[in-house]
Swiss-Prot record:
InterPro entries: ATPase_NBD, N-acetyl-D-glucosamine_kinase, ROK, ROK_cs. Keywords: ATP-binding, Carbohydrate metabolism, Kinase, Metal-binding, Nucleotide-binding, Transferase, Zinc. Disulfide bonds: none annotated. Zn(2+) binds at residues 157, 177, 179, 184. Its EC number is 2.7.1.59. Pathway: Cell wall biogenesis; peptidoglycan recycling. Pfam families: ROK. Belongs to the ROK (NagC/XylR) family. NagK subfamily. One of its GO terms (biological process) is peptidoglycan turnover. It catalyses: N-acetyl-D-glucosamine + ATP = N-acetyl-D-glucosamine 6-phosphate + ADP + H(+). Catalyzes the phosphorylation of N-acetyl-D-glucosamine (GlcNAc) derived from cell-wall degradation, yielding GlcNAc-6-P. This is N-acetyl-D-glucosamine kinase.
Length: 303
């Protein structure tokens, strides 16, 4: 059995998957914030419960936001302060008496989709998350590409390209990102960015679902906004796809529920790619909230 943990600032979710990659059991508990020992206890207790329920000693994979293992072997995860700065992988491996694998949660999302029965035919899979922020991951031949700093796929921290400014206007405001840089594309393409763009152009403060509802009702202003957003997304993805050239692009996160993104993006991409380039197949993520657990569990399938 393969145990996959999706750990975030509010919850620890465990999913248990069998050899056919089917979910057999899952459980969620709140993420402890009081101490590192309480955090370790929460993870270990879930593993013990799974072992007992299923009568096996399953392998353990963990997806967590941030850098799973820095040069000194410690975790960097600002959203999980109880464990950040601690040697999480080594400590859990010792307590659980088994190999524990860690990776960035966005890489786990991409790995989950790459191992979907429909998608295993594609050698290079790019996962793109359009949620609170913008992130993603790359999977080559069933294995995540992490890079030495675990930042492969941090697409949201690429800067706006020149073509984006041509589209939006050279007086378009470059917003400061939480990473400290100016003009990171997640400030414009995330769910928050989608809403910010609407407020910038129309001086109305609406959340993304409200804007999408107006678009579905045929509102002209919402229609113009969505057209602009899709063009901006295509411009930015054109740069990324020219570098990565994936066979498949899978889009997840809250905005992936907006069908116009997956249905209309393909027709806008070619003008931003090299003439000889082929646009990837574009699909919405298949596994929703279970994707993080699936991908973490499948870290043990990548040998």
């Amino acid at each position: 059995m393969y145990y996959g943990f999706d750990i975030g600032g509010t919850k620890i979710a465990l999913g248990v998957f069998d050899s056919t990659r089917r979910l057999q059991w899952e459980k969620r508990v709140p993420t402890p914030h009081t101490s590192y020992s309480a955090f370790l206890d929460a993870v270990c207790e879930l593993v013990a419960e799974a072992d007992q329920r299923l009568g096996v000693k399953g392998s353990v994979g963990i997806g967590i936001p941030g850098m799973p293992e820095t040069e000194d072997g410690t975790l960097y995860a600002a959203n999980v302060p109880a464990a950040s700065g601690k040697p999480l992988r080594a400590d859990l491996s010792a307590r659980l008496d088994r190999d524990v694998r860690l990776d960035n949660d966005a890489n786990c999302f991409a790995l989950s989709e790459a191992w979907d029965d429909e998608f295993t035919q594609y050698p290079l899979v790019m996962g793109l998350i359009l949620g609170t922020g913008v992130g993603g991951g790359l999977v080559l031949n069933g294995k995540p590409i992490t890079g030495q700093s675990y930042i492969t796929g941090e697409f949201g921290h690429m800067r706006l390209p020149v073509d984006a400014l041509t589209l939006m206007g050279f007086d378009f405001p470059l917003r400061r990102c939480g990473c400290g840089q100016m003009g990171c594309i997640e400030n414009y393409l995330s769910g928050r960015g989608f809403a910010w763009l609407y407020q910038h152009y129309y001086d109305q403060s609406l959340q993304a679902p409200e804007i999408i509802a107006l678009w579905e009702q045929g509102d002209e202003q919402a229609h113009a906004h969505v057209e602009r957003y899709l063009d901006l997304l295509a411009v930015c993805l054109g740069n990324i796809l020219t570098i990565v050239d994936p066979d498949l692009l899978v889009i997840g996160g809250g905005l992936s529920n907006f069908t116009a993104i997956t249905t209309q993006l393909a027709e806008r991409l070619p003008r931003h790619l090299l003439p000889v380039a082929r646009a990837p197949r574009i699909e919405r993520a298949r596994h929703g909230d279970a994707g993080g657990m699936r991908g973490a569990a499948f870290l043990h399938l990548t040998d």
